[in-house]
């Protein structure tokens, strides 16, 4: 049994196989976006139903938190009364609100006696930079992948291995005893050897408003490649023409080709493309070999 709650941009969740859902959400509206803000009850009811039917379950909790509207409960907002910027105070309270709901969900798993037999993955879609979801730089694309599975995963922190969101599906399938199909990209994150063998990671950044559903290259802004200490950001010559959102949001900030030494310059302040043309060419060749639109 599978449940989707929260944000979903691809029509109705049942079209991709969810057995249960809160309905379509559209972009910034819909009943499903009430999850977390109003109640966690739809998730708790679903878990109860799965237990009653003695079936394994999958829950996708995608709350519209800490997204706008920034309307945190007063009990949380009061904790940040000393923050001078009212907008920042509200945002901090929104983050704590999200944190609360995640804690409530974890507590519910314990209450139902399934916490030790449930793999929990916490993901985010952008990094910590202002308007970070649009940046091809590290403070935009570095996001948390936190896993919790008592008895199966030992607590640790790893900031060095190359991991991508495409690894989530093969990880969940393997954990559930399902062999991922050979055509599925990504690696099983529970297999440390497989993760360590990954030498290259590719990233792509698209326009906020999709230009074409069938031709993804028309919406492309940047292509990036990371291998070893090197990272190349290749800006598309004729990107989609949309108005930047300010704060650098999908706004070109550098040269067409930017090469960074992430070991010596983790904040990507020095473009070394002209000093190392051979590295640029190597990474461009890798990108072109990876980017094949079917």
Predicted regions and their residues:
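Histidine-centered active-site microenvironments of extracellular/periplasmic hydrolases
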Residues: 16, 107-157, 164, 212, ...
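Catalytic-site neighborhoods of secreted/periplasmic enzymes
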Residues: 1-45, 132, 202-205, 238
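A short beta-strand-to-alpha-helix junction
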Residues: 33-38, 86-101, 135-143, 153-170, ...
């Amino acid at each position: 049994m599978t449940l989707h709650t929260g944000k979903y941009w691809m029509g109705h969740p049942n079209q991709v196989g969810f057995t249960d859902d809160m309905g379509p959400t559209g972009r910034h509206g819909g009943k499903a976006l009430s999850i977390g803000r109003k109640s966690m009850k739809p998730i708790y009811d679903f878990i109860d139903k799965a237990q009653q039917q003695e079936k394994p379950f999958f829950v996708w909790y995608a709350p519209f938190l800490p997204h706008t509207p920034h309307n945190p409960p007063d009990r949380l907002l009061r904790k940040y009364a000393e923050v001078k910027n009212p907008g920042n105070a509200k945002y901090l309270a929104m983050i704590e609100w999200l944190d609360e709901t995640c804690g409530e969900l974890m507590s519910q798993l314990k209450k139902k006696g399934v916490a030790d037999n449930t793999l929990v993955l916490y993901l985010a879609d952008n990094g910590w930079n202002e308007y970070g979801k649009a940046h091809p730089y590290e403070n935009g694309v570095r996001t948390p992948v936190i896993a919790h599975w008592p008895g199966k995963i030992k607590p640790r922190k790893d900031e060095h291995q190359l991991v991508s969101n495409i690894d989530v599906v093969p990880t969940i399938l393997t954990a559930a005893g399902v062999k991922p199909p050979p055509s599925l990209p990504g690696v099983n994150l529970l297999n440390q050897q497989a993760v360590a063998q990954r030498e290259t990671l590719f990233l792509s950044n698209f326009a906020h408003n999709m230009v074409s559903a069938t031709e993804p290259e028309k919406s492309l802004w940047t292509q990036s490649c990371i291998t070893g200490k090197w990272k190349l950001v290749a800006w598309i010559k004729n990107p989609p023409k949309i108005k930047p959102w300010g704060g650098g949001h999908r706004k070109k900030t550098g040269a067409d080709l930017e090469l960074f030494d992430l070991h010596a310059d983790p904040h990507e302040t020095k473009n070394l493309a002209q000093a190392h043309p051979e590295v640029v060419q190597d990474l461009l060749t890798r990108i072109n070999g990876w980017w094949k639109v079917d």
